[in-house]
Amino acid sequence: MGTNFLQQKTSDLNMTFEDFVPLYIADMKNRFKESTWLTKEHIIRTKLVSYFGKRKMCDICSKDVMAWQNEMMGHRSEAGKAYSPVYLKTLHNQLSAVFNHAVRHYGLKANPAAQAG
């Protein structure tokens, strides 16, 4: 309880993205239908934590989000297929939701996903 409690009270969110995700999950999981949550959790695990995981929440800026967006837009499946615009928007919305939660409830100063657009 000690470390997590201290991390939850940190005003600059000086923890990594992957360390923040369990806090987000604990706060949000029960607010969605199970099928919706499973989709969100898959995106968080495979698209967000895999890219931003080791970065501190307070150090991620809009340029980092734009670099991630460019990587997602450039992704191709083994068959050469790109992610659809709707899926790319879904990915961005989930990233923005994580950062919005950090801003509203954990003292992060700004949402870099909202700034990146």
Please give the residue ranges for each predicted region:
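N-terminal core-binding DNA-recognition domain of tyrosine site-specific recombinases/integrases
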Residues: L13, I25-P112
